[in-house]
A protein has these predicted regions:
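Active-site entrance/lid segments in N-terminal catalytic domains of soluble metabolic enzymes
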Residues: 1-136, 141, 171, 259
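Alpha/beta catalytic cores of nucleotide-metabolism and tRNA/nucleoside-modifying enzymes
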Residues: 3, 71, 113-144, 149-271
Length: 271
């Protein structure tokens, strides 16, 4: 716990907006220490988090009471359905993480048989956000968590209704990343039922090149923000809020139509 507090202080001293992720079981125990360290945003995260916690071994977290008494904004997740998201929003959460098992390193969908396709989950949670806005006048941010490796994936998440995205594997491809091209992300570690694995992502460039470019490859894994801006411009939108209103469709052939040569040669969209 002291090490967590020390790292928060180091990032704050560097002028970085700092967040910390805790599980529901450890939230109350860690709360005072991390808030005293100057934390800007608290993330309460599990595979699936509900507004009502049940525990036979410890005092369950009263999420609504905790959020209302906490001094900084709280983001909660994951969730993947309209009703679960609406319940989380009604606790006072500033943002909701969307995604159960879409990440590259996560095996929850195979181990537990639980998950919702990410585009559907984002759209459903965005619908809950609009209902909550109509009921309360409070806008809750929808954050797509996992399943995005390319700029086009981020663009599609925004058009489905996300306000922001949380990515893992693209950042592990940075030269600066400590694992040097490997990713073991936020997937659940468990001594008897692990639900995550280590995957190779390869080193592709600097963190700046991955996020802001310039790209020296044409597969969409570099210059993610440049791809998002170009996607918005191509569709005729200037802001993310406008882009959320773009028309979307289910198009399985989008990645393969007219790309036979790329696939046969293993280049571009064919690898």
């Amino acid at each position: 716990l002291e090490l967590v507090a020390e790292r928060i202080k180091q990032m704050k001293d560097a002028g970085i907006i700092t967040s910390a992720s805790v599980t529901p079981q450890r939230t109350s125990w860690m709360a005072k220490t991390i808030i005293d360290s100057g934390l800007d945003i608290l993330v309460i995260q599990g595979t699936v988090v509900s507004a009502e916690h049940v525990s036979k071994t410890a005092e369950p977290l009263n999420l609504k009471k905790f959020i209302r008494e906490f001094e900084v904004p709280v983001i909660v997740g994951g969730c993947a359905s309209y009703q679960a998201a609406l319940h989380l929003m009604r606790t006072g959460a500033a943002g909701v993480l969307v995604g159960v098992g879409p990440g590259n390193a996560c095996t929850s969908r195979g181990v537990l048989g639980i998950g919702v396709p990410q585009a559907t989950a984002i759209a459903d949670v965005a619908g809950a956000r609009m209902r909550h806005l109509d009921e309360t006048g409070v806008y809750v941010h929808v954050i797509a968590d996992g399943g995005m490796s390319k700029g086009g994936d981020i663009a599609k998440a925004i058009t489905c209704g996300a306000d922001a995205v949380m990515v893992g594997s693209p950042l592990t491809s940075a030269i600066e990343a400590p694992a040097h091209g490997f990713h073991w992300g936020m997937a659940t570690f468990h001594p008897t039922l692990p639900r995550g694995t280590r995957v190779r992502t390869q080193v592709r460039g600097t963190l700046k090149e991955i996020l802001l470019g310039p790209a020296h490859e044409n597969d969409g894994r570099l210059n993610l923000m440049g791809a998002l801006r170009t996607s918005m411009a191509t569709c005729g939108y200037e802001t993310l809020k406008e882009f959320q209103k773009a028309e979307i469709m289910l198009a399985p052939s989008l990645q393969t139509e007219g790309k036979a040569m790329q696939r046969s040669q293993g280049v571009g969209m064919g690898h």
